[in-house]
């Protein structure tokens, strides 16, 4: 019995420590993975805590301390759930304030409510869609490809071009494909691109690759079923930076909107406010991408900052960012939000107080559900024909 009580108490302590990751930014790269689990799969931890609380209630040893830690852990694990309901409650009003009355109630939308606890469990399933890989650009020593998911709807349809994350130096077009499948099922063509990576290829190589991918999709529109008048760019982290920079500098009228998941927007500010080195050596990442520090190649940093290219004609923008992101500071999205507001650009910043980097890893988690709800309406709005 003593051994069983000790094991139970140690498990409760471990859960208590894990629960703190739902409240505070992750302290290291390795705990970041745990933070994703805690914040985007909270129902698992809530169930465990409830079971341990019941077990502890009937135990004779360590009852007081164990019960207190169980209660605190339950509250912490519940934070993403409560936060999602809170954000979702006001989301319709904020979205329509940004993009117009009625834009949340367009016909044919799949997810009718921003968030539901039961959807975290009932939404789990296999929704894969087949893709075809096409080569879209060739440079010396590198052949670039894109994965094309055909819209699950007949006729010419808008195309969403996706840029993966990976600090500009890693990753590929198959990163987190759930959003590709989801959007294709909603009737959009999806092209997830591979682009040239640092440190071998430096800025603005990925922007050039995005332009080449769009050109390829336009020239093969008939066979792919792409409506070339309607492109939306979507990217995560480094990919978020790439799609913002592309949408703001290519000046292509066919790009109707841009969706940025936690992408850096002001590279000088980002360099001068580096991440916790236990999480990521962000200055080294930027030096590899730009070819030096912000003082060594200042023009590269200026030219690589999407915030510097905002005008009144800037593409409508949707930003989604976790406020507990330890990889890309949430302040960077706040800064772009302010600049877009000053220039009266239609935009929305969806801030998620509990969320960390890659928060949409599970589209059924609190962050994933809110992201789906918002993206679906944003894309439908900017591609209305």
Where are the language model's segments positioned?
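N-terminal cap/lid segment of alpha/beta-hydrolase-fold proteins
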Residues: 20-49, 106-154
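Hydrolase active-site cap/lid region
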Residues: 97-113, 244-296
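Short beta-strand element of the alpha/beta-hydrolase
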Residues: 156-166
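C-terminal catalytic histidine-bearing segment of alpha/beta-hydrolase fold enzymes
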Residues: 2-5, 21-30, 320, 331-385
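Primarily recognizes the serine-hydrolase "nucleophile elbow" in alpha/beta-hydrolase
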Residues: 25, 212-275
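Acidic catalytic loop of the alpha/beta-hydrolase fold
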Residues: 267, 324-328
